[in-house]
Amino acid sequence: MEAAICELTWHEARNFRKEGDLCLAFGSGKYKFEVVEGWFKPPKGWHFGWIPAVACDLQGRVFVYSRSEHPLVILDSDGNFIDEWGVGILKDAHGIWIDAEGNVYCTERNNHCVFKFNPKGKLVMTLGTPGKPAEREGEPFNAPTDTVTVKPNNGNAPIAALFVSDGYRNFRVHKFTPDGQLIKSWGRQGSGPGEFNLPHCVRVDRYNRVWVCDRENRRIQIFDLEGNYLTEWRNLLRPNSLFFDPHDDVVYIAELEHRVSIWTLDGELIASWGGGKPNERAGEFLGGPHGIWVDAHGNLYVSEVLVNGRIQKFVRV
């Protein structure tokens, strides 16, 4: 499937500015958002490097996963510090996922593993050997990028499973049982169907289709739960991550080339902003959107790489 391309400039994509305050709104139609300036309020004296990933649980907590001395920081919805996890464990943040039970999966790129924490922050499972890449080509893991879970109550999924995109050097997607037993893998380096040039994120929609951000091929590939190729969206701006609206057939995409875009699951672009030059203005993107999540209230969170400590909250209006 050939996805439509947005060519809006920042001035065209911006919908309005509130006089008397500094809120800017972005998007269009049903999907308009105001950026909340100064939302991220870490403890005084804490410094953050790149923030590759962000996620929200059903309690409204926001998990900020960064490459810093405080790798996994938990905030309330107003950006205030609650807790931190993973000090001494998490070494190289990349992707994050929170399942329906509140378990948190942290994918460590150059640590070559996935850590699973329970909702209270206890480490309960490790996939891979921390610090050691796979000994054989194609086996898990060699610079993995992201993780997602699917359970029988997600549509009509026949079994529970866990998928990991792997990643910078393996060009594979792996499917595991919930307790971490490898079921199968697929993919190889290339640009054809089922081939990857950096599988950067993996997610599963409500129709049990596996979506993989094939970043350096500038596309998203879509598979069934067994890894059979279904279709693809081309001509994206190097997609880093995606998130499915839990209430509607809509997908949010974070694209490295300074854009956030919102699409129907049929590939129709319905809103976007950014996509031009780096911009430090609130609501725009200075480094590159890398992590994306929508909370239970429809608020959007976007974290960036290639710049230190940048994460933004957008409130649905």
Predicted regions and their residues:
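Eukaryotic scaffold repeat domains enriched in small/polar residues
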Residues: C6-L8, A13-V317
